[in-house]
């Protein structure tokens, strides 16, 4: 279906256009064909209205190849850096794509027996390929909380990870 949408992820970076106001690059039809052919993993993210949306993992490509795969449109950016500039729906789409593809990269082998796993159910399950094992692996759904601790006025508590860029602070989570 030419309306089918694909969002690309490369080494945990999201495919976007623009610097000051980044927007996800959504590949469709012929524009998606090379990326789809080269993707290590293709995962169904869901429906946007009646249009299917998939995530493409291009992490196996060299940095000199990845832009060719997406038609030399946009750049790949760290979602933590561009996230605050994205609207809620775009940020959610890119975060979901990144998270599910990261899960796939980390679960290519069965945690029980060590055999390779294969994606099933649109990419939301990985099944052990060893016949006498066959364990189903699912993405983790850990409970988490994000909070804003404030004094009821203008002041709040923010945290900062040493790995984050200078000047980047966040609300607390855990």
Regions found by a protein language model. Name each.
Residues 1-87:
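N-terminal alpha-helical interaction blocks
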Residues 45, 117, 147-150:
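A structural signal for short hydrophobic beta-strand segments in well-ordered beta-sheet cores
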Residues 104-107, 114, 125:
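Residues immediately within or flanking Cys/His clusters that coordinate Zn2+
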Residues 93-101, 111-119:
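Short, intrinsically disordered, charge-biased short linear motifs at domain edges
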Residues 38-40, 105, 123, 142:
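Short connector loops at helix/strand junctions that flank enzyme active sites
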Residues 126-170:
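N-terminal strand-loop-strand
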Residues 119-120, 139:
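Short, non-ligating residues that shape and space the ligands of small metal-coordination modules
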């Amino acid at each position: 279906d030419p309306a089918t949408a694909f969002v690309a992820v490369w080494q945990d970076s999201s495919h976007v256009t623009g610097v000051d106001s980044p927007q996800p690059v959504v590949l469709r039809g012929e524009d998606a064909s090379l990326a789809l052919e080269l993707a290590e993993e293709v995962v169904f993210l869901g429906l946007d209205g009646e249009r299917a949306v998939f995530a493409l993992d291009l992490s196996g490509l060299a940095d000199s190849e990845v832009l060719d795969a997406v038609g030399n449109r946009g750049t790949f950016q760290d979602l933590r850096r561009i996230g605050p500039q994205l609207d809620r729906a775009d940020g959610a789409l890119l975060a979901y794509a990144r998270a599910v593809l990261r899960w796939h990269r980390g679960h290519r082998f069965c945690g029980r027996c060590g055999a390779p796993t294969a994606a099933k159910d649109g990419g939301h399950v990985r099944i052990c390929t060893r016949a006498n094992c066959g364990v189903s692996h699912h993405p983790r759904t850990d409970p988490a909380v994000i909070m804003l601790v404030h004094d009821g006025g203008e002041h709040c508590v923010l945290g900062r990870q040493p790995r984050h860029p200078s000047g980047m602070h966040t609300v607390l989570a855990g």
